[in-house]
């Protein structure tokens, strides 16, 4: 009687081993990005670890990575898909529902109006004026209207964008968000004579938080005006970030209905609920209702930054510069018009809401 050897757990172990090279590469790039992100100069200019991670990923992805891609692709894919979702869920720990009270009803309405109008304008201009594909348009719109690179990354699973489409959207956020760091303090000084907005730093903080792309960029722009402006700007920005989850759910439902219309209702269309967005809200709710130890929150936020940086590095590794060049100037022009709306339209609506 012959007995066959039992290889219990061999296949799962082999699958895990396939992930290790890509995970180590993504983790190494994320670690370097986080260390570089601690530079005072980079922090002052609002350049976050997430931005640095995708830049490093693109540099390595277009030089050394093609030689090792075969052995690393599985882990890199895991980083930009699974770890991304985990990072978005943990991002909720940075927020509390009490933040909403910090900006008041008018501030919340301003955030919601800027989100809806900016995203709607992106959809209109991107596909009709510039003739961009819808996925790139939606990603640029999400990044401009909510919270920059994190919003682009969170929207990608819903719209199923390609790596180069995500990279193009993130690059527009970096360009115009960085420009905003220098523009808003200059506008604040000019407005001391013009008087278009109330001169108090708190109002300018809400204006900045409701219109600047990235959280790091909001902090940098607000601090250039003053501590009060920076604190208010961060609260207004966090309220805007909190709108990410309902935005993703509504976007998923809208895309499902749109597909059904294009297929002339030929079959049942499933609305995909982005469960990581639900997890984001649940974690924010937990943070609002339960007083968690500050040390624990700090460590989890550090872990979250690392996971998101790994996801951004993974995205960069899969991005080909030739594909970005083929996209041309149209994505940048769309982002420029959205930035103009955020600055001008946002200032007008801030005056109406808070004056």
Swiss-Prot record:
The family note in this entry says: Belongs to the UPF0324 family.
- The answer on whether this UniProt entry bears the keyword Nuclease reads no
Q: Which protein is depicted?
A: UPF0324 membrane protein PA5383
Q: Which InterPro entries match?
A: UPF0324_pro, UPF0324_YeiH-like
Quote a single Gene Ontology cellular component term.
plasma membrane
The cysteines covalently paired via disulfide bonds are none
TM spans (from-to): 20-37, 44-66, 71-93, 100-122, 137-159, 166-188, 233-255, 275-297, 307-324, 331-353
Localization per Swiss-Prot or TrEMBL: Cell membrane
Per UniProt, the keywords (alphabetical) are:
Cell membrane, Membrane, Transmembrane, Transmembrane helix
Question: How is the protein disposed in the membrane?
Answer: Multi-pass membrane protein
On whether Disulfide bond is a keyword of this UniProt record, the answer is no
Q: What organism is this sequence from?
A: Pseudomonas aeruginosa (strain ATCC 15692 / DSM 22644 / CIP 104116 / JCM 14847 / LMG 12228 / 1C / PRS 101 / PAO1)
State the Pfam families in the record.
Cons_hypoth698
